Amino acid sequence: IKPMFDIETRYYLRLNVADHPGVLAQISKILGNHQISISSVIQKEVDSMTQTAEVVIMTHPAQEKAMQQALDELTHLTTVKEISNFIRVENI
């Protein structure tokens, strides 16, 4: 049995972020620093009341340990308001 931190899989992230220039660059830099490659990104329309946007990211396969470290860093960004979903995606 492999330790959880050694598992490698794709990840689905849904984030609520501040609608400011450079936010996506901050997020991709953190993921890149942990050797996590982005497969796709979708940004939903801005909520005019809260001035936040929903960003959905699908990654290429990455190690669980790296993803957990990246998530920890993302939670400390003032521009990331919430990590709404974090889902491991297995190929079947």
Describe these PLM feature segments.
Residues 1-92:
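A conserved regulatory-domain signal marking ACT and ACT-like small-molecule sensing domains
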